[in-house]
Amino acid sequence: MPAPSASRPAGSLRRLFSPLLSLLLVLALGFGLGGCVTTGLASSADSPWQPVPLATTANPLAVAFTDDRHGFLVGSNRLILETDDGGASWEERALDLPEEENFRLISIAFSGQEGWIAGQPGLLLRSTDGGQNWSRLFLDTKLPGEPYLITALGRSSAELATNVGAVYQTRDGGNSWQARVEDAAGAVRELRRSVDGRYVSVSGLGNFFSTWEPGQPTWQVHQRMSSQRLQTMGFQPDGALWMLARGAQLRFNPDAADPEQWGKAIIPITNGYGYLDMAWDPRGTIWTGGGSGTLLSSSDGGRTWQRDPVGEQQPTNFTRIVFAADGKGFVLGERGSLLRWVG
């Protein structure tokens, strides 16, 4: 009778443990994948944000105030709302525009009682009485691109940037405009202006960014820092840049004079949603927001982050975070979502 094979016990052990190992592998994969769709961050004990109900399903895109209490909120589908209590409540307004045109009001700015609204397609409005009345300024048909960002600069003065990076300035209430850049930057997905007049833009495909400052004849092109396409860029309070990229990555530029210098990528949370904007509140806390109610804050320069308990309850994508010089703050979201800073 042949001796029993020495390999049989080992084979029996393999058959015994194989289902167990498979189960452990499935569980490990489950937990690993679950980490991509759960928060992984602690939620703050309280929130400085208060939801503000809006009687609209349009997307708020920009907000500006004439004084401490009176202001306007504009957005898609000709949305314009007015507040007289600092943004705690809003009432719908109407603009005298052709009904067949579904304008997207994308930018608004005030300098005292003089206001400007930029919209698409081809819309520019001006008010001299705090927004009670608006007059339309007809733009040159040869204007490169569509109006994208309007900045009020003082009495009868404003600066208009388009979605291809053309920059124009008026000093006579919009009757004439002077080009500030010789060549446009090309199609952009995002464009921001600093308080001292510098611009940063992200290319339409997110594969590079460009900068421009007063006195330069053309935009300066810069390559992105990683394989991840760029989403949004803007300016930190000290004038240096910040960057949001696909894959929920964010970076900070440590030197405002060198847009090629960047810190390491920071990924606060991997919940499957990217970030769409970033801003600094009056206390210096950094806020970033994005898809599916993602609203995070960091009080240590981006090293650690917390989820905001009010933000995560909102069924929306946060697209813009705005803090005014006087301390007012708002988070704008899709489908009529708005949060107001209450400190």
Q: What are the functions of these language-model segments?
A:
Residues 19-34:
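Bacterial N-terminal signal peptides
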Residues 4-23:
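Bacterial N-terminal signal peptides that target proteins for export
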